[in-house]
């Protein structure tokens, strides 16, 4: 059995990791840590774990003993020391935070206000959206199966990268005219108390936030640029949905070829993802719906064309806690350790 530990176990992504790992046939959940709840039982914090898990929450420094894999789900700037300890102990480290997502340290400084503490570790790290890493002109040179540090992608970049990768690889769209309108459930903001996620603030409300300044912007642009092979800038506007979980991204891009048919683009997308366990390209005429990916590691993509404006419109839906966080982290672990990619993740989402 693979011995797995989780740092930041009481945040939303950490709790989702625990839920999914408990169903993984190759994993033994070893140690859990939480800065806020050291000494408490995890099932005191999350009663859904009663009769499924009985573990005390440890100090972070106690996590590394008798462990093969460490997941960390922490705010930006807190993962470098953990990664260094894991690297020294030959433990696979998977970071669900932002510290190992950006290639360029200047971007990390500008958007997160931090510097790389161990620059050599950032050269070792692999950023992986598994379905499209082979098209990434930076990270496809590294072997995920031999990774020691994995930067798990953010939720918005995952939904957007999967939606746009086939169009960019096949040069269907003009790279300088991409508009992205994304909506996320409240769990995307984390468990920490914030005014805009109070029930009375977000219930029966719907509004954009962090317009033109969301921290996922450089990660989105990096992912798209690495795939296309040239620098890409996008217009990205996120919105807060009055839901617990899920992301819907609606993407608008001008077509390079006015004569291309939607069926040809659709066939290319179907072929692009034909071997993917988790990306579902819907039939022409169907529209991706958040309802059918919740609690799953699936990404649903629907394709549409506006002939009047020569625009390709792509709708992408994921569960931000699963494919956008914990599920994708487990998917990356599976690949890195030579397991079946869908191990512990191959379940059908509820219909309602």
From Swiss-Prot:
E.C. designation(s): 1.2.1.38
What keywords sit in the KW lines?
Amino-acid biosynthesis, Arginine biosynthesis, Cytoplasm, NADP, Oxidoreductase
Extract the InterPro entries matched here: AGPR_AS, AGPR_type-1, NAD(P)-bd_dom_sf, NAGSA_dehydrogenase, Semialdehyde_DH_NAD-bd
Provide the active-site residues from the annotation. Answer: 155
State the superkingdom.
Answer: Bacteria
What is stated as this protein's family in its record? Answer: Belongs to the NAGSA dehydrogenase family. Type 1 subfamily.
What is known about what this protein does? Catalyzes the NADPH-dependent reduction of N-acetyl-5-glutamyl phosphate to yield N-acetyl-L-glutamate 5-semialdehyde.
What protein am I looking at?
N-acetyl-gamma-glutamyl-phosphate reductase
- The gene designation is argC
């Amino acid at each position: 059995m693979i011995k797995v530990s989780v740092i930041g176990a009481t945040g939303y992504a950490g709790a989702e990791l625990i839920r999914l790992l408990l169903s993984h046939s190759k994993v033994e959940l070893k140690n859990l840590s939480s800065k806020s709840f050291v000494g408490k039982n995890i099932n005191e914090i999350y009663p859904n774990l009663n009769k499924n898990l009985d573990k005390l929450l440890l100090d972070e420094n106690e996590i590394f003993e008798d462990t093969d894999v460490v997941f960390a789900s922490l705010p930006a700037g807190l993962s470098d020391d953990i990664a260094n300890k894991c690297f020294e102990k030959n433990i696979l480290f998977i970071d669900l935070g932002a510290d190992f997502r950006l290639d360029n340290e200047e971007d990390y400084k500008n958007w997160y206000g931090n510097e790389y503490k161990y620059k050599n570790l950032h050269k070792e790290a692999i950023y992986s959206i598994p379905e499209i890493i082979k098209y990434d002109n930076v990270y496809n040179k590294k072997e995920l199966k031999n990774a020691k540090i994995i930067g798990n992608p953010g939720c918005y970049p995952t939904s957007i990268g999967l939606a746009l990768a086939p169009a960019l690889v096949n040069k269907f769209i003009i790279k300088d005219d991409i508009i992205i309108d994304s909506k996320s459930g409240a769990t995307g903001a984390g468990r920490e108390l914030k005014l805009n996620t109070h029930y009375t603030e977000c219930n029966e409300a719907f509004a954009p936030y962090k317009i033109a300044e969301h921290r996922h912007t450089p990660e989105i642009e990096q992912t798209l640029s690495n795939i296309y092979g040239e620098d890409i800038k996008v217009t990205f506007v996120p919105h807060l949905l009055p839901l617990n979980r899920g992301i819907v991204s609606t993407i608008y891009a001008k077509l390079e070829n006015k004569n291309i048919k939607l069926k040809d683009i659709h066939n290319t997308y179907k072929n692009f993802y034909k071997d993917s366990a988790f990306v579902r390209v819907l039939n022409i005429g169907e529209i991706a719906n958040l309802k059918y990916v919740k609690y799953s590691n699936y990404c649903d993509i629907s394709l549409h064309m506006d002939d009047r404006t020569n625009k390709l419109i792509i709708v992408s839906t994921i569960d931000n806690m699963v494919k956008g966080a914990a599920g994708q982290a487990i998917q990356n672990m599976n690949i890195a350790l030579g397991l079946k990619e869908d191990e512990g993740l191959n379940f059908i989402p509820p219909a309602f």
